[in-house]
């Protein structure tokens, strides 16, 4: 994310997120097949308190990552008719690094941690997401969707408190603002709330609550 802001990396990021996506969309058009594109809330400006609607076109990316993912979205939508553009946020899964693994490691080494409390969204568990994507791919209900876990909107502070509670950690969590925590290279959205009602409206099963997803996830990893 932050590395994408470095001038020497921008062309490469755009080549992957926009150019690569466009190439795949063009092949899908030739083969007359469906395309699934995973995108992000970063295509919006991250302001306000209202959940972003899947079909909202008020795009205003805050950073290079968001801008190039938006370019990828538009490449898909402008090339194909049979597509699913699925936006997710705060992703965690068994493989790779993620916020949960980071906070578990930090919690082992420190008695107190500072976590931002003014960025609001909902986590997405890749296992739950994958099941939804299979159902989508087997349908013809094309379009834009949002697909984070249910369970309500939370801050990174709230998420950390629940992580430590379920993991049995006694680490103290202190809420701070983004300004107090310190800025990163890539601007982060304050409002990552995604409205997911379109899933049920089209007959798809919403993802389970993030609290349940976290409980299942912690059983899958070593910490």
What do the predicted segments below correspond to?
Residues 12-23, 67-68:
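Glycine-rich NAD(P)-binding loop of the Rossmann-fold in SDR/ketoreductase-type enzymes
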Residues 132, 139-184, 190-191, 210:
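Mid/C-terminal beta-alpha module of Rossmann-like enzyme folds, strongest
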Residues 29, 60-84:
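Active-site Tyr-X1-5-Lys
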Residues 74-121, 127-128, 135:
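NAD(P)-dependent short-chain dehydrogenase/reductase
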Residues 22-62:
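Conserved Rossmann-fold NAD(P)-dependent oxidoreductase catalytic core, especially the SDR/UDP-sugar
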Residues 190-223:
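C-terminal amphipathic/interface module of NAD(P)-dependent oxidoreductases
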Residues 21-24, 73, 133:
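Conserved internal alpha-helix within the Rossmann fold of NAD(P)-dependent oxidoreductases
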Residues 1-16:
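NAD(P)H-binding glycine-rich loop region in Rossmannoid oxidoreductase-like domains
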């Amino acid at each position: 994310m932050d590395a994408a802001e470095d001038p020497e990396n921008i062309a490469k990021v755009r080549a992957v997120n926009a150019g690569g996506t466009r190439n795949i969309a063009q092949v899908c058009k030739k083969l007359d097949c469906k395309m699934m594109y995973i995108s992000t809330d970063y295509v919006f400006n991250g302001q306000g308190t209202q959940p972003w609607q899947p079909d909202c076109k008020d795009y205003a990316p805050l950073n290079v990552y968001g801008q190039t993912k938006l370019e990828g979205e538009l490449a898909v939508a402008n090339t194909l008719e049979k597509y699913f553009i699925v936006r997710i946020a705060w992703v965690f899964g068994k493989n790779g690094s993620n916020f949960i693994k980071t906070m578990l490691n930090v919690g082992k080494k420190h008695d107190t941690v500072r976590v931002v409390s003014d960025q609001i969204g909902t986590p997405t568990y890749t296992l739950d997401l994958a099941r939804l994507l299979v159902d989508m791919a087997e349908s013809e209900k094309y379009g834009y969707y949002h697909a984070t876990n249910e369970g309500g909107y939370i801050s990174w502070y709230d998420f950390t408190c629940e992580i430590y509670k379920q993991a049995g950690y006694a680490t103290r969590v202190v809420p701070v603002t983004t300004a107090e925590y310190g800025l990163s290279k890539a601007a982060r959205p304050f409002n990552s709330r995604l409205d997911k009602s379109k899933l049920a409206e089209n007959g798809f099963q919403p993802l389970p609550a993030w609290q349940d997803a976290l409980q299942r996830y912690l059983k899958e990893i070593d910490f």
